[in-house]
Amino acid sequence: MAITDTEFHQLADDMFQAIENAIETAIDEQDADVDIDASGNVLQLEFVDGSKIVINKQEPLHEIWVATRFGGYHFGFVEGKWMDGRNGGEFMPFVQESIERQGGIKLSF
């Protein structure tokens, strides 16, 4: 079943907030060095080496797009989960792994 624009934004905003909270915890507990910039439909993480992970909402498609230094990924809401259309991976574990791989920061959700 398709989700409405309102549902899409609520689900995406909840995920963005969970990521921000986990990063803030990592900064406090691990002395992680990462900058968070949340602006509109975009959440951008910049690591000490200058690399970035950009997560953005694609409202017309009801997708979340993620760009890492390893590639770009598109996640759609399928059966209650955000899933990658190419490889079937789930969004939050993917983001957790990407942040650890790219920035060396272990997140807990």
UniProtKB/Swiss-Prot annotation:
GO molecular function, one term: ferric iron binding
Keyword Metal-binding: yes
An example Gene Ontology CC term for this record: cytosol
Top-level taxon in the UniProt lineage: Bacteria
GO biological process annotation, one example: iron-sulfur cluster assembly
InterPro entries given in the database record: CyaY, Frataxin/CyaY, Frataxin/CyaY_sf, Frataxin_CS
Keyword set, alphabetical order: Iron, Metal-binding
Stored SUPFAM superfamilies: Frataxin/Nqo15-like
Family: Belongs to the frataxin family.
Function of the molecule: Involved in iron-sulfur (Fe-S) cluster assembly. May act as a regulator of Fe-S biogenesis.
Protein name: Iron-sulfur cluster assembly protein CyaY
Native source organism of the sequence: Shewanella baltica (strain OS155 / ATCC BAA-1091)
Gene: cyaY
